Amino acid sequence: MDFKDYYKILGVEPTADEKAIKAAYRKLARKYHPDVSKERDAEEKFKEANEAYEVLGDAQKRAEFDEIRKYGGQHGRPFQAPPGWENRGGAGGGFEGGDFSDFFSSIFGARGGNPFGGARQQRSAGRRGQDVELELAIFLEETLSKESKQISFQVPQTNAAGQRTGFTTKTLNVKIPAGVSDGERIRLKGQGAPGSAGGANGDLFLTIRMAPHPLFDVEGQDLIITVPLAPWEAALGTKVAVPTLDGKINLTIRPDSQSGQRLRVPGKGLANKQGERGNLYAQLKVVMPPASDASTRQLWTQLSEKAAFNPRTQWSK
């Protein structure tokens, strides 16, 4: 199943308002209507435009689609719905709304409608389950991992009358979407508390908390690491094995490097929602060795006499 970017299909920006979305849909519908267009793929493009407007023209579906886009789906590329996105158009009694794609069905089920009349909503019997709010601490490495993160949490149980009867532990494997940031809120549809008397499950809301890293500071998509250097390494140049989120790299330190200098390593930062990675900045820090014995102090004395170096010459200008 391939990902469909409905914004690209209609040719609008993700920030487009309802009026712009409707105008873009009308334009494409007129252009590719099978009774008007002679293009070979007109019918397919007409269906795509209808499907795109079915989603973007409905506030609830658009919000759900925007959540899905956070997982880094790219138009025309293979895609699998993340955990918690249930097909609600099957046995639940959704309305049949047209010839929609597998992608649409995997996200929205069969909840269709008239593009100009608004989508018809399924009415569920019983009482909807309670939403669950959790904070999820993640490490920087997990934002790049393709592995799922297992979480366990308590959800309330209710009887047929909707009265709480206790709690049960629920365990999920959650894929951390690319580009996630501290404080971001992720919704997992239908993964909250179970409904009663046939009602829909509640949702699980995860608030992301980035755990502090012992080596890296974060500046947007970029990472900063402090690289300690001995004075002779900074003066003569060297190669240093520098940690990154996905293994060590050999960093070349040029002669006459200065403390505080930053070296940029492209593509070793954090990923955005499209999977593109920021930079790693290696900030050099010259660390002085202890001069605790006479021979070491003598070497420093000899260096000071030979170098005749004054780091404060600019003060006399």
UniProtKB/Swiss-Prot annotation:
Domain of life from the UniProt record: Bacteria
CDD domains linked to this entry: DnaJ, DnaJ_C
Pfam families associated with the record: DnaJ, DnaJ_C
Subcellular location(s) per record: Cytoplasm, Nucleoid
Domain J, first and last residues per copy: 5-69
Keyword annotations of the record: Chaperone, Cytoplasm, DNA-binding
Location, primary (coarse class): cytoplasm
SUPFAM superfamilies: Chaperone J-domain (SSF46565), HSP40/DnaJ peptide-binding domain (SSF49493)
InterPro entries according to UniProt: DNA-bd_curved-DNA, DnaJ_C, DnaJ_domain, DnaJ_domain_CS, HSP40/DnaJ_pept-bd, J_dom_sf
GO molecular function: bent DNA binding; unfolded protein binding
Swiss-Prot/TrEMBL GO biological process terms: chaperone cofactor-dependent protein refolding; protein refolding
Recorded coiled-coil stretches: none
Record-level GO cellular component terms: cytoplasm; nucleoid
PANTHER family tied to this protein: DNAJ HOMOLOG 1, MITOCHONDRIAL-RELATED
Function according to Swiss-Prot or TrEMBL: DNA-binding protein that preferentially recognizes a curved DNA sequence. It is probably a functional analog of DnaJ; displays overlapping activities with DnaJ, but functions under different conditions, probably acting as a molecular chaperone in an adaptive response to environmental stresses other than heat shock. Lacks autonomous chaperone activity; binds native substrates and targets them for recognition by DnaK. Its activity is inhibited by the binding of CbpM.
The protein's name in its UniProt record: Curved DNA-binding protein
Lineage, uppermost ranks: Bacteria, Pseudomonadati, Pseudomonadota, Gammaproteobacteria, Pseudomonadales
